[in-house]
């Protein structure tokens, strides 16, 4: 029971990280004026893509424990 709760919580966490990074990246790409305080747009986009990739990799790894 606790095993399932922990695994589900981790899955929710990683999915939330992906959603947050995707939403922020979309704003950066579609409304760059809204982020004037971030002059390093390419670096920030790269950081968000890294965050998405990391969370997706964690989700794939997590699937091995859900079997």
Predicted feature locations:
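Extended, charge-rich alpha-helical interface modules
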Residues: 2-67
């Amino acid at each position: 029971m606790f095993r399932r709760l922990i695994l589900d919580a981790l899955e929710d966490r990683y999915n939330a990280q992906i959603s947050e990074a995707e939403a922020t990246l979309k704003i950066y790409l579609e409304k760059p004026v809204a982020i004037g305080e971030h002059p390093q747009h390419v670096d920030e986009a790269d950081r968000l893509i890294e965050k998405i990739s990391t969370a997706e990799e964690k989700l794939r790894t997590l699937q091995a424990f859900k079997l």
